[in-house]
Amino acid sequence: MTSDLRVSLPGLELKNPIMPASGCFGFGQEYGRYYDLNLLGAFIIKAATKEPRLGNATPRVAETPSGMLNAIGLQNPGIEAIMAEKLPWLAERYPDLPIIANVAGNTEADYVAVCERISQAPNVHAIELNISCPNVAHGGLEFGTSPEAAATLTKACVAVSQVPVYVKLSPNVTDIRPIAKAVEAAGAAGFSLINTLVGMRIDPKTRQPILANQTGGLSGLAIKPVAIRLVHQVRSISNLPIIGMGGVATAGDALELMAAGANAIAVGTANFSEPFACPNIIKALPDELAKYDLHDFKTFAVNQEVL
Amino acid sequence: MTSDLRVSLPGLELKNPIMPASGCFGFGQEYGRYYDLNLLGAFIIKAATKEPRLGNATPRVAETPSGMLNAIGLQNPGIEAIMAEKLPWLAERYPDLPIIANVAGNTEADYVAVCERISQAPNVHAIELNISCPNVAHGGLEFGTSPEAAATLTKACVAVSQVPVYVKLSPNVTDIRPIAKAVEAAGAAGFSLINTLVGMRIDPKTRQPILANQTGGLSGLAIKPVAIRLVHQVRSISNLPIIGMGGVATAGDALELMAAGANAIAVGTANFSEPFACPNIIKALPDELAKYDLHDFKTFAVNQEVL
Amino acid sequence: MLPLEWLLTIQDQTEIAPGIFELRLSGDLAQEKVQSGQFVDVKIPSDALLLRRPFGIANVDAAHNTITLLYRTVGEGTQILSECSQGTELSVLGPLGGHGYPIDQLKPHQKALIIGGGTGIPPLHELSRQLVAKGVQVQHVFGFANQESIFYQAEFEKLGPTAYATNDGSYGYKGHVGLLLDEQFADAATTYDAIYACGPKGLLMAVDNRFSAHPNAYISLEERMACGVGACYACVTKLKVDPTIQLKICDDGPVFKTNEVLL
Amino acid sequence: MLPLEWLLTIQDQTEIAPGIFELRLSGDLAQEKVQSGQFVDVKIPSDALLLRRPFGIANVDAAHNTITLLYRTVGEGTQILSECSQGTELSVLGPLGGHGYPIDQLKPHQKALIIGGGTGIPPLHELSRQLVAKGVQVQHVFGFANQESIFYQAEFEKLGPTAYATNDGSYGYKGHVGLLLDEQFADAATTYDAIYACGPKGLLMAVDNRFSAHPNAYISLEERMACGVGACYACVTKLKVDPTIQLKICDDGPVFKTNEVLL
Ligand SMILES: Cc1cc2nc3c(=O)[nH]c(=O)nc-3n(C[C@H](O)[C@H](O)[C@H](O)COP(=O)(O)OP(=O)(O)OC[C@H]3O[C@@H](n4cnc5c(N)ncnc54)[C@H](O)[C@@H]3O)c2cc1C
Ligand SMILES: Cc1cc2nc3c(=O)[nH]c(=O)nc-3n(C[C@H](O)[C@H](O)[C@H](O)COP(=O)(O)OP(=O)(O)OC[C@H]3O[C@@H](n4cnc5c(N)ncnc54)[C@H](O)[C@@H]3O)c2cc1C
Ligand SMILES: Cc1cc2nc3c(=O)[nH]c(=O)nc-3n(C[C@H](O)[C@H](O)[C@H](O)COP(=O)(O)O)c2cc1C
Ligand SMILES: Cc1cc2nc3c(=O)[nH]c(=O)nc-3n(C[C@H](O)[C@H](O)[C@H](O)COP(=O)(O)O)c2cc1C
Ligand code: FES
Ligand code: FES
């Protein structure tokens, strides 16, 4: 029996549920040298901000048990360069690859400006509103830790966006549920879960943090149980679709997160361990489903029917 | 040159900074069969509650990459049995081993009653106020996530306790600093950091959580970078001593957490991987210090002078 | 101080049935007094797996200084273990379990019924060996998924008669062990001086029910464990007579009398 | 599509100086065109280490289908790597680095100065080999902590004269490479047609300063990396003329012209 890996989310008719996570795959040009990105279900590009950003000083990454810390600091060429170069490059080579644009900013006005502009790109099918970056002084967590601030920002972004807006929530909160509810009420099309936890490594020799930014975002296998918990928790209070992520490295991990309530899966850190992680997972999904006598995702994520 | 591993904290003059973490070493009777507990710097016993507790249904543990989840649910024989049997057993065999009593409860009255009673045991040198257990319906996180609630509880417990009270904070909060500050102002002698993160694993076959309690506390190597960050963050706003924990398995891990600001180190999950983890770490500390031309902890943790 | 941790060397490892491995480990743990039903807790050689894996002791060979484990590959840990080559050193805790199968009460020529299913069977091999060494007559009743998954058939038949039940009827009785017991061992409670069981929950419940009044009937339980020595309270089970009393399977078990704990 | 990932087999591994290992890997990566200065990114066989480890390519031997890495054990990853036995298969990405050391501009009998320190030296071996194969005359100037830590001395001396500086003066010049350059290679900027360097930051800064105007002088940088292919922005460095322009060391480097980037 052949498998049907398709999943359908607002704005996103995907041939399979697997997509590179924002910030772990640039704008596709690098990994695009090594395999055909058309294999992917979708692709979440690196955060776009209004102005070009240089990000933080180096070192920007450090290793942790079954995980890593990053403090890239949203380096990106800015919305204009992304509109002029990055998105057209993708559109030309991969006209059928749905792009999800990760959007960040310092102020509401920044977010709104970028959402309005980037959602007009013909290959951008959805926005992932990044209100959860732990590595920048402004924006990021400020909007992501208060239900009111998150709702106000979401509403403003939804109003100007031509495509559905998924809000990427932070795991670094006491209770994610009021934030998720507020964001849903403000018009979000779905959630993206989870961004990185905040962590630190110290060099015992210098007794200083390894990262120039001191703290960084913890990602990779180590955070998978936290991602499962938060996806499960948000699923328990909302029927909106969830793009799940956090420590997915195998088809088994992907199914576990989908069993928790995710409708599609983003893969971040695993790309670094294994550059072919995404195509490998996509290839392994039919056999993984077959282990449980399944051939599609229909019975996953309670809300799948609704879509 | 010989090393001097002593550290000095309120209530605790320790021959070395290494102690088993609460809940990972019972009341000492089991590991006491296999090695001399007098090797330990101190020992934090399993949570004590007013009434005997049965804890949660099984399965109570699940594995995660470089970590584990537990949802024991504070099973313990209750304060009376602990006073009558567990503490005397320790006092008789290990009269010089400083015991730190982990205290939990449903209500402020519960906490106060247990603190008052247990702090009178002759071998209890300090209390670790557990306001951060993620695995119980009441108490635990309720007190641990609000600065006001944490302060009120701390104040009440400090008032009745014959020994210094260290407050064990939760990592599952948006910002730990106001909670730490409130607890300090309320009279805490120090902090204990960190309790477990909240996580979940799902059995892909049944699509149900593996743990009967659904969620569990994530511990082990995986959370080390989160522990380092929180110890560093609390150290940056307080000079109170910190008992650091979270993923310590080697002498190197212990030094890293001390470099972040911890004055002593508790070892939890590592006991399960390696039952001799604590004595092994103690034995390895002099060489680990020597790597950095050090022979004691004097230059660690900014507040060491103050004590 | 009791000994606890051993560095054992993989002597050899063989796949004796699909997904079932026989692992022979050499080292001085084999010189310890092992009660059948006791288990070991194996550190899997993977940096990311913090918890040890418990396995029953299927055989102790003091003369050759080896112990044998039999296990099924079910997840990551057993998969990695099955790929370890000869000569690999493993950290092993044991013998663990404060209570194995009691056999001292039995005399030569008395009769024991040994009931097992799937990967519950390994510790029953050491049990049967020890009973036979005492002169006890053993009868085995084992359940498997199908003929293909049967292992250690010759080893057990050497020790005593062995009846098989398979789910699909591909070998022996068709159906589960409970039905086989009803049909062919209806008088077991009076015929046998001791009853011993290990296997999946369903089998244990069947044995617990059928032999609840038998003065010498024992079942061995499994539960997810962390410490393996009684310190973490992960593996508890409740007493039947008073469910507010909890026992630890790793330390107060893994063997309990029938009718003793809530299944 | 470009090739990227290879399964290479450890042919042999030797500790050639205290804590310095020579690792020979066999597999078809050795058939790729490798520019000296390019590197590989090795998956360490440990489940808990997610990030690969970058190492310069010290030698390519297409005839024997092997490449050689030289590395120092500094932390957990290199420690585990050093314990891997012959026959172990490693997943290796490479050749990585969009820009290695340019040599096409040099003609036979022209002169190249190769400056290195410690574990920056490995890629300079492949560089020197390629230069000598072209008929370029090479002079090496290497810095080490002490005599004991010197490696590949015979290999380099076979290719060209080699001057040594050690911190403690136990071999060659006493002091760091910068001082040795000042004292014994004061005219280097005009004497040599090309300058190549790799090593610790201090050495690179010394070279960058001394040869900032040289039209053919190159340094190779190191930085903590995640992806190794240019996708994650972990390993950036700023352009000197315009620090708002950032280059990725893994992809736009690791070799840069002197005076090109901010050190
Ligand atoms: C006292 C005792 C004796 C045992 N004896 C044997 C034996 O002789 N032969 C045999 O094949 N199996 C035996 N088991 C079961 C064996 O421990 C598990 O199959 C094994 O731990 C699975 O590990 P894994 O990494 O392959 O599976 P995973 O599912 O990946 O393991 C994840 C976690 O769950 C735990 N776990 C999974 N299944 C079980 C289980 N059934 N019981 C306890 N913990 C589990 C693992 O130990 C690990 O901590 C015994 C279990 C116990 C408690
Ligand atoms: C392009 C390039 C080429 C290199 N070539 C060589 C070589 O030929 N020989 C050699 O001995 N070393 C070389 N290095 C350095 C080598 O990568 C590190 O020594 C190694 O990664 C340390 O790993 P570890 O696990 O032992 O150390 P740990 O400190 O435990 O590593 C922790 C993390 O930090 C990273 N890290 C630590 N030190 C460095 C470093 N100096 N540079 C980059 N990342 C680091 C590791 O990759 C890992 O991600 C090179 C580095 C780069 C960037
Ligand atoms: C190097 C790196 C860069 C990242 N950059 C971004 C980013 O620009 N925007 C964003 O929303 N998330 C960013 N993330 C977070 C990931 O998209 C993802 O949410 C997180 O890493 C968890 O998934 P993983 O465990 O699969 O990596 C980044 C993560 C890493 C490791
Ligand atoms: C099985 C288990 C039981 C625990 N029980 C308690 C407890 O009773 N009280 C408490 O404050 N913390 C408890 N903890 C948390 C630990 O004391 C410690 O804070 C945490 O596990 C982090 O340290 P580690 O990574 O070294 O395990 C428990 C942890 C585990 C794994
Ligand atoms: S496994 Fe820890 S008490 Fe049984
Ligand atoms: S390591 Fe990812 S961009 Fe260089």
From Swiss-Prot, chains A, B:
It comes from the Bacteria. The active site is at 133 (nucleophile). Its main location: cytoplasm. It catalyses: (S)-dihydroorotate + NAD(+) = orotate + NADH + H(+). SUPFAM superfamilies: FMN-linked oxidoreductases. Keywords: Cytoplasm, Flavoprotein, FMN, NAD, Oxidoreductase, Pyrimidine biosynthesis. Pathway: Pyrimidine metabolism; UMP biosynthesis via de novo pathway; orotate from (S)-dihydroorotate (NAD(+) route): step 1/1. Substrate binds at residues 46, 70-74, 130, 195-196. Signal peptide: none annotated. GO terms for cellular component: cytoplasm. Its EC number is 1.3.1.14. Its cofactor is FMN. The keyword Oxidoreductase applies. GO terms for molecular function: dihydroorotate dehydrogenase (NAD+) activity. CDD domains: DHOD_1B_like (cd04740). Binds 1 FMN per subunit. One of its GO terms (biological process) is 'de novo' UMP biosynthetic process. Catalyzes the conversion of dihydroorotate to orotate with NAD(+) as electron acceptor. PANTHER family: DIHYDROOROTATE DEHYDROGENASE (FUMARATE), DIHYDROOROTATE DEHYDROGENASE (QUINONE), MITOCHONDRIAL-RELATED. This is Dihydroorotate dehydrogenase B (NAD(+)), catalytic subunit.
